[in-house]
Swiss-Prot record:
Function: May have a role in promoting tumor progression. May block the TGFB1-enhanced cell growth.
Protein family per UniProt: Belongs to the glycosyl hydrolase 56 family.
Disulfide bonds: C43-C333, C207-C221, C358-C369, C363-C418, C420-C429
Protein name: Hyaluronidase-1
UniProt domain EGF-like: residue ranges: 418-429
Gene3D superfamilies membership: Aldolase class I
Amino acid sequence: MAAHLLPICTLFLNLLSVAQGSRDPVVLNRPFTTIWNANTQWCLKRHGVDVDVSVFEVVVNPGQTFRGPNMTIFYSSQLGTYPYYTSAGEPVFGGLPQNASLDVHLNRTFKDILAAMPESNFSGLAVIDWEAWRPRWAFNWDAKDIYRQRSRALVQKQHPDWPAPWVEAAAQDQFQEAAQTWMAGTLKLGQTLRPHGLWGFYGFPDCYNYDFQSSNYTGQCPPGVSAQNDQLGWLWGQSRALYPSIYLPSALEGTNKTQLYVQHRVNEAFRVAAAAGDPNLPVLPYAQIFHDMTNRLLSREELEHSLGESAAQGAAGVVLWVSWENTRTKESCQSIKEYVDTTLGPFILNVTSGALLCSQAVCSGHGRCVRRPSHTEALPILNPSSFSIKPTPGGGPLTLQGALSLKDRVQMAEEFQCRCYPGWRGTWCEQQGTR
């Protein structure tokens, strides 16, 4: 089984040089990339705390900002005239997508994109974060139910003599058609202006697998969710990358359910990508280093079950997002710095190197390793008997030292199969061509 595996010499991997050398598209034809999407520049400017992520294999924007040449995220107030309702129920820009001007939005969006991405050859991640409403009627529950209520009211006003079932059907159709027009139109404009960017919406697809209290929690998407996601084929077809969220709710802390939760969320992204006819559509889950809405940092095990799980499924990488709230005080900045230095950094070096070595050993360097269905617990984590991670004397970047043993290479081939990069094929991605 190991006869095809490439011999790998002793590896001394200086991650600083790797990060500085990656000026090509951020994630294309690389096994696994970590993107630091955080305004941790404030830690240095306001508190004198230098969160130095450049020493790891983490693609960052200059100044560690949310927007730059490697990635740009557009929040709702930063791109066009996104319609929504405030928490008080007041409409902004019409409130509903079917009650707002798409032309005005696209004209404003045109200017916003050029201002945020001045370079026409931008080839980084381009993420749109619209969270007020969801494009499928059935998914607008709880606080988002206002979009269904106001959609019904709009139809009722237009047709006061219609019975309730007619109103419901028309309201649903009008809302979903308008939502599609707004989202697809915004993506299309972005791709026209910056065609090399990896355009997509944060949080899509979702799996809605939040039933953590169930004694037999499987992590699977609830019944009907995949069918609803299949109705968003227009979104997957228009996207150039998928950005599902794998933020870990605090309810998962201390349970054994994290891997199941993440596994099925990432799997749903790959499922819709395949259904859209683009198996090479990059999947880049959004992760946090904290439990969502808390200041509690993830343990090493939770990193394995989120970042490691994403890598095991063949994700192109992960986006590590840190809330502005987590950088407000000197204490929180120091906590982030210590975590990066002692826990996150070494783990990122481990998993990115593991994915790289697996790609070279199993997939001829021309594809990503994807965990075989028969090995549900396998992760691209390096064998501590074969590798060590050590700081460089004098405070330089971490260095990975070691070599894959024959046993390591055989185990990789047993646990992982290949998803070839475009232009390569074969069991081990050893042949050029698409057939």
